[in-house]
Amino acid sequence: MTGIAPIALGLDFGTTNTVIALSDSADESHLISFKGEDSTGEIFRSALCFWEEQSGWNGIASEAGPWAIAEFLGSPLDSRFVQSFKSVAASSIFERAQIFGRPFRFEDMGRLFLHKLRDHAGGQLSKLPSRIVVGRPVEYAGPRPDPALARQRYDLMFEQWGSEIHYVYEPLGAAFSFASWLERPTTLLVADFGGGTTDFSVVRVAEPGSSQRCQPLASSGVGIAGDRFDKRIVDHLVLPLLGKGGTYRSFDKVLEIPGGYFGDFADWSRLALMRNKRTLDELRKLQRSAVDPTPIGRMIALIEHEQGFPLYEAVGRAKRALTASDEAEFSFSGGGVEINTVVSRRDFERWIAEDLRRIEAAMDAALVKAKLEPADIDRVFLTGGSSLIPAIRALFERRFSVDQIATGGELTSIAHGLALIGSDANPAEWSV
């Protein structure tokens, strides 16, 4: 990069990770690298850690990204670790999280996250470009997502970042990035596999030098991605040890334990928030009436001992191992709970089979909207961490030839493309 002031900033605010790119021309962008003892380079984890401190805002201090992880690991019982909070952006059910008795709305957490992110950029973001391009999913995560509510919350989250803020579908950012490598006119299908959603865009790419290089034809998405695959692992390997499928006594009846507690426990965005007096009191009451109280006791212990992040890490290790091997060891130890078992890729693929069918249906919806058949697609670009899962790759290889499919920049391509869109003469053409 030269010393020229950047024209635009592209922000890929992801469910799992956040990446930022700056552009100073229509065909060049570079990533912001975060430096420091706990830094993970260009990838900033979309997570927050809170702890009580008199000098903090309203008596609560906070950290974000890899520094949030470091704070949590240093003092897990005295902190609250929140991750995947983007997943509740479009949820009308979520109003606020109670953290150490203080309410935090989505936009409160979002503004804190952005403030810490800028702090850790080491001056690279001290002066923001006038044009900010923020990625958003085509379809938000969660049951009955409300995109208008998500837009309102995003506006509040980003209101201090400038007046010219554009929201662009995340797969379009990846398409713009990949198009810079193409040397001939191409009909391109982009699939973005994030933490909370899977999104598709079909784009017509003109030859280099054209006045409008990329023309979006259609987009679609579904609220299923990496976190859902994690949930399947937790559902099959962890929750049966915590009381799922068990029963409790209510007067003269024996009833199945309600599934809501298990749904919350298997959702990374909600697990940390279960550590509150009301939920723990309800679980202790349930434990007293359970036919077998021991499993519910394990759940209570995991929540009280803040074992959400260690469990997340254990699930992630097993899932990553299954991308390269037919079997993986799932090993977790914490809160008095020990799990050591072997999981096969065949079992994992069986658990996520219905999720894959819904993902494939979303891809078909994008093609239908674009009025194209699979044979009309010249290239397919897969991005996002879950694109590395063999079953995901196989889904595309059934529909397209292997030499049509490209991968790369799984965690960074969207931010690159968003920054390039921001340097375009009229980014509003891409905005939604």
List each language-model region with its residue ranges.
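Glycine-rich phosphate-binding loops at beta-strand->alpha-helix junctions
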Residues: 134-147, 307-308, 375-396
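Early-domain small/polar-rich strand-loop-helix modules and first-structured segments
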Residues: 1-96, 220, 225-264
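Phosphate-binding glycine-rich/basic clefts of nucleotide- and phosphate-handling proteins
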Residues: 41, 205-334, 430
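Conserved phosphate-binding/catalytic loops in two-lobed NTP-binding clefts
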Residues: 160-168, 375, 394-420
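Adenine-nucleotide phosphate-binding core of ATP-dependent small-molecule kinases
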Residues: 98-119, 300-308, 337-366
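Phosphate/ATP-binding catalytic cores across multiple sugar-kinase/actin-like superfamilies
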Residues: 112-125, 171-182, 318-321, 351-377, ...
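Conserved phosphate-binding catalytic cores of ATP/NTP-utilizing and phosphoryl-transfer enzymes
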Residues: 1-7, 165-191, 416-427
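Gly/Thr-rich phosphate-binding beta-strand-loop-beta motif of the actin/hexokinase/Hsp70
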Residues: 2-29, 179-214, 382
